[in-house]
């Protein structure tokens, strides 16, 4: 099989995995009363002040709206006043797809992604600026940075990592799913002391053949050397997708860090 065909199969698998996940999430009915908590009545929404913010960044070829059902997994009372955002990446030519235009946060030169794959440093930094603008808007609206969580899958996971590391303040946390390091070690010079206090959750399927498991494994040592606390979770048998177990784990992880953040405020 030619390298181009292998790539096309890998890309198709990545997009299919994202589509299947979105479909599965849409089919999953939220627990009783969850819809009312996630979408308050207009008067309640006006009276309630958002206490936290979760920003979810999708993978290559996907869209923000397709990932919105993810929030149905976050049924704990702590998320009653949480604001969610699922932005969509701009349509851009992607090198690994022979220049085809598709939703992409930055350019990707090759798939499968390994720990040694070339990176689009300038494109990543431009995308980071856009993510930081989203975060700054929520901070300006009164949400403490310590109650802001950035999460992402695949390419969105790589952007999550870059955005959290380069944000000048301590955030509630960054959660990476099947992501990778989108830059070299030189970026550590740009990381502020406050950013190093932001906790990282990194989840990766061992059977991932799009963003190889070795690419995920390279993350924690880099983060630890840079002064970050990183919790790494490996999922046997999981390919390039997100499992329900990962999302329930994320809910618990954010809830714990959100509680810690709120205690600091009180």
UniProtKB/Swiss-Prot annotation:
Residue runs in coiled coils: none
Q: Which UniProt keywords apply?
A: Fatty acid metabolism, Hydrolase, Lipid metabolism
Active-site annotation: 154, 208, 240
Q: Which GO terms describe its cellular component?
A: cytoplasm
**Which Pfam family is one of this chain's hits?**
Abhydrolase_2
Q: Does Calcium show up as a keyword for this record? A: no
Supply the SUPFAM superfamilies for this chain.
alpha/beta-Hydrolases
The GO molecular function terms of this record are:
carboxylic ester hydrolase activity; palmitoyl-(protein) hydrolase activity
- The answer to whether keyword Mitochondrion applies is no
**Broad enzyme group:** hydrolase
Q: Which domain of life is it from?
A: Eukaryota
Enzyme Commission number(s) of this protein:
3.1.1.-
Q: Which GO terms describe its biological process?
A: fatty acid metabolic process; regulation of plant-type hypersensitive response
What does this gene product do?
Possesses carboxylesterase activity in vitro.
Family according to the record:
Belongs to the AB hydrolase superfamily. AB hydrolase 2 family.
Q: What is this protein called?
A: Probable carboxylesterase Os04g0669500
What is the species listed in this Swiss-Prot or TrEMBL entry? Oryza sativa subsp. japonica (Rice)
What lineage does the source organism belong to?
Answer: Eukaryota, Viridiplantae, Streptophyta, Embryophyta, Tracheophyta
